[in-house]
């Protein structure tokens, strides 16, 4: 019998459990997130992590709540003015979910980096908002060397900016959109071939004929097609139309010679493209197999790469060039008995393949002196059912992005083919940071400074472009606009960015879905966004 607490939790988190499952929720509840600066953007991010039940969070902020903070931050009130910003925000955020533990550190990140940089290495992930460039570079370096993920978030006027910094992020459950079914009709495994041979469409009662699964129907007519075309699978549009006609001819006729209403045959005709999907290993999986980390297994090799290597060995041996069978089939018109039998054929093959991969895993673990049980059966099943969708994301460090010799000029210059591309906003953010470094403030923070700062900001932009050897032109309109922003943090933009950033944090923690690589820019002016590898 299920425990009452567990039932309540399932009810509370029902919708998200459908997205990332029990194991994803467990990862979320075990995570400790660090937020640097309780700004409007920062508290919006935490709000979207506290509500789904993040384990715990710590806010680092040495600032006191100002009137401006209370005006643009939903989690700070007039009564908060004068209090430490981290403490005030933490108290309000904790009210959202009693399952979540919150804490705060009343100190600036600069002081912590000076006195105790290892402090940041205790967290699952660090989220930094509205930090100065110099502080970001120091923080990013500490976390990069400790392999702690860092998400930089910034709201600047009508611009939203995010940067993910993570050395390597492997994903087993990438949840691709419109994933193709794994039916293997072009390369039927022996158990499937034997099951298909048990059907004889030409000598069936009408009831059985109209309740035969469409997978069986397509397989039967595919065998007939092979006989007529020397084993060539239908590929072109015309060939697939001819194949559909061949299936259509198999629909039973009534006593008047008119076709019967057989929905399963119509379903088969609609699913020709799905069924004739070629069984092959995606190039992205081949890249993983050829990666040095997959080839060279040691005692320190992470679980993902041991699983990937076992998968590679399965493909070379038992799989005969193919990945493990996924073991699922779509819903279809069929009687329960026929559907379940067909479903079991795929399920049993999937179990058999998973067991074979498991044997390779055990041998690999033993070869590097690790216990065979150190990788669970659950992890093994997840790998096999998602073997076609594995992903590895590797981001560049912030030091590489900012380095004169390592800056990704090609990405910036090619994006500037369109003078209004979102990459312009990135260039402007770099320019305002240079402005701050030179003048100790951001451009246009006071109304009387807007006009006089236009020339100064343009000079900073020109200097930045020249220093990095970027032969691109930025419209003056953008310089004027960024001066008018005055480094403001509008709550509408902060709220949007908070939702987007929390989504990426959850992806990193649960290791499900695919994070962007590595920079995301949102334009509130044009309501568009783009990602770049910088």
From Swiss-Prot:
The modification N-acetylalanine is found at residue 2. Transmembrane segments: none annotated. The keyword Chaperone does not apply. It is found in: Cell membrane. Pathway: Protein modification; protein neddylation. InterPro entries: APP-BP1, ThiF/MoeB/HesA, ThiF_NAD_FAD-bd, Ubiquitin-activating_enz. Residues 331-344 are annotated as: Interaction with UBA3. One of its GO terms (molecular function) is ubiquitin protein ligase binding. Belongs to the ubiquitin-activating E1 family. ULA1 subfamily. This is NEDD8-activating enzyme E1 regulatory subunit. It comes from Mus musculus. The lineage of its organism: Eukaryota, Metazoa, Chordata, Craniata, Vertebrata. The gene is Nae1.
């Amino acid at each position: 019998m299920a425990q009452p607490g567990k039932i309540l939790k399932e009810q509370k988190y029902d919708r998200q459990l459908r997205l990332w499952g029990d194991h994803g929720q467990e990862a979320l509840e075990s995570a400790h997130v660090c937020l640097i600066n309780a700004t409007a953007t920062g508290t919006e991010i935490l709000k979207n992590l506290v509500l789904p039940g993040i384990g715990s969070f710590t806010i680092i902020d040495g600032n006191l709540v100002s009137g401006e903070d209370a005006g643009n931050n939903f989690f700070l009130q007039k009564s908060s003015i004068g209090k430490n910003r981290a403490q005030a925000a933490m108290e309000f955020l904790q009210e959202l979910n009693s399952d979540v533990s919150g804490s705060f550190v009343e100190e600036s990140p600069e002081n912590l980096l000076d006195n105790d940089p290892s402090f940041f290495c205790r967290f699952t992930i660090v989220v930094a908002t509205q930090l100065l460039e110099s502080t970001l570079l120091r923080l990013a370096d500490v976390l990069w060397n400790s392999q702690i993920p860092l998400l930089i978030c910034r709201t600047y006027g009508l611009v939203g900016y995010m940067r993910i910094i993570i050395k390597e992020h492997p994903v087993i459950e990438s949840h691709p959109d419109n994933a193709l079914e794994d039916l293997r009709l072009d390369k039927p495994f022996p158990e499937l071939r034997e099951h298909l041979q048990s059907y004889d469409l030409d000598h069936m009662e009408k009831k059985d004929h109209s309740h035969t699964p469409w997978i069986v129907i397509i397989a039967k007519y595919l065998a007939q097609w092979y006989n007529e075309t020397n084993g060539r699978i239908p590929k072109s549009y015309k060939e697939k139309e001819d194949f559909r006609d061949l299936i259509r001819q198999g629909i039973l006729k009534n006593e008047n010679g008119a076709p019967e209403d057989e929905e399963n045959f119509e379903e088969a005709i609609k699913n020709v493209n799905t069924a004739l999907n070629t069984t092959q290993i995606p190039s992205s999986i081949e890249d993983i197999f050829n990666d040095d980390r997959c080839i060279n297994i040691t005692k320190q090799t992470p679980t993902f790469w041991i699983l990937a290597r076992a998968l590679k060995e399965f493909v070379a041996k038992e799989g005969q060039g193919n990945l493990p069978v996924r073991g699922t089939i779509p819903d279809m018109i069929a009687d329960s008995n026929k559907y379940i039998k067909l479903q079991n054929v795929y399920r049993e093959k999937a179990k058999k393949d998973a067991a074979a991969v498991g044997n390779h895993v055990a041998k690999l673990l033993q070869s590097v002196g690790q216990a065979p049980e150190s990788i669970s059966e659950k992890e093994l099943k997840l790998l096999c059912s998602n073997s076609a969708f594995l992903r590895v994301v590797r981001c560049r460090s912030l030091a590489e992005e900012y380095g004169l010799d390592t800056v990704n000029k090609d990405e910036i210059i090619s994006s500037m083919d369109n003078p209004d591309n979102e990459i312009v906003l990135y260039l402007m953010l770099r320019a305002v940071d240079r402005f701050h470094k030179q003048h100790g403030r951001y451009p246009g923070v006071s109304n009387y400074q807007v006009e006089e700062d236009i020339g100064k900001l343009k000079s900073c932009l020109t200097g930045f472009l020249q220093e990095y050897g970027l032969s691109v032109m930025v419209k003056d309109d953008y310089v004027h606009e960024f001066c008018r922003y005055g480094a403001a943090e509008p709550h509408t933009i902060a709220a949007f960015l908070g939702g987007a950033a929390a989504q990426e944090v959850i992806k990193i923690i649960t290791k499900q879905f695919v994070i962007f690589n590595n920079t995301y820019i949102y334009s509130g002016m044009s309501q568009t966004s783009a990602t770049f590898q910088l």
